[in-house]
A protein has these predicted regions:
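Structured, active/binding-site neighborhoods that engage oxygen-rich ligands
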Residues: 1-226
Length: 226
C-alpha cells in the first residue's frame, strides 16, 4: 500500500476512521467536557459509542474489541469505571491506541499526564503491560510535545520527569521495548498484532525508521493485521 485507500472488511471510504480513533475522540471530548480526567464520564462516552455510534465515522459502532466490550458490560452492570481485566490474555492494544488526548491535554503537567495515562488504560485494559505501555508512550509524546527530538525520546535513558522510570519502573515486557528492542528488529519479528507489546514495538519501529508522518504511517500500515 502506498496511499490511503478505502475498502477492507468494513467497506469503509478512504479516510473513515475505525474503533480506536472513535474511542480517542470519546476520551478527548470527555477531557474537554469535564475540564479534566473523569473515568466515569469516559466510560459513559465509550458506552454511547457502543450503543449509538457516537464518534463513529459511519454512525454505528463497529469492530469493538472483546476486552473493551467486556469492560463496558461490567461498567453497565456495576457502575465501576475501572472495569478493565488484569489477565495476560486481555493485554490488547485498545487503551494505547486511544491514548493521545491524555498527554496532549496534560502536556504542561507531566506528572498528571503519566498518572492519567495509566488510569485511562485501567478503565478497559488493566493488565500491567497495557498500563505500562500507556505510561511509556505518554512519556514519549510529552517529550515530543515539549520539543525534544526523536533521538532523545527513543533513547533508553530518556525520562519525561527526572528519574520517573527509576522510581516507577516499567514491567519487564515494556522495559525491553523502552530499552530499544524495536531498533534491532525487522518484520516478521516486528508484527502489527493486537497484542499491546507488539503494537507498541511496531509503532516505535515505524517511527524510528522513517523521517516524516506519511512514511511512518505507511510503514505501520504495510505490516498488516491490526
Amino acid at each position: 500500500i502506498n496511499t490511503i485507500i478505502g475498502g477492507g472488511v468494513h467497506k469503509l471510504k478512504a479516510g473513515q476512521w475505525t474503533d480506536d480513533t472513535s474511542l480517542a475522540l470519546c476520551l478527548a471530548q470527555s477531557l474537554i467536557d469535564c475540564k479534566g480526567f473523569e473515568a466515569k464520564d469516559q466510560m459513559q462516552k465509550y458506552c454511547k459509542w457502543d450503543e449509538e455510534g457516537y464518534m463513529s465515522s459511519t454512525g454505528k459502532c463497529f469492530d469493538i474489541g472483546n476486552t473493551t466490550l467486556k469492560a463496558l458490560d461490567k461498567f453497565r452492570a456495576t457502575g465501576e469505571p475501572y472495569s478493565g481485566m488484569t489477565e495476560e490474555s486481555s493485554a490488547g492494544n485498545g487503551s494505547i491506541m486511544r491514548l493521545a488526548p491524555i498527554p496532549i491535554y496534560f502536556s504542561q503537567n507531566p506528572e498528571d499526564a503519566l498518572k492519567y495515562a495509566a488510569l485511562s488504560s485501567k478503565t478497559t485494559h488493566a493488565n500491567e503491560m497495557c498500563v505500562d505501555a500507556c505510561r511509556y508512550m505518554a512519556g514519549i509524546m510529552l517529550g515530543l510535545l515539549s520539543g525534544e527530538n526523536k533521538k532523545t525520546v527513543l533513547s533508553h535513558e530518556y525520562s519525561p520527569i527526572n528519574n520517573y522510570f527509576i522510581n516507577n519502573p516499567l514491567c519487564e515486557a515494556i522495559r525491553e521495548v523502552a530499552n530499544g528492542s524495536f531498533k534491532h528488529k525487522q518484520p516478521p519479528q516486528i508484527k502489527g498484532s493486537g497484542y499491546v507489546v507488539e503494537s507498541l514495538e511496531a509503532a516505535l519501529w515505524s517511527f524510528y525508521n522513517t523521517d516524516n508522518f506519511r512514511e511512518g504511517a505507511l510503514k505501520a500500515v504495510n505490516l498488516g493485521n491490526d
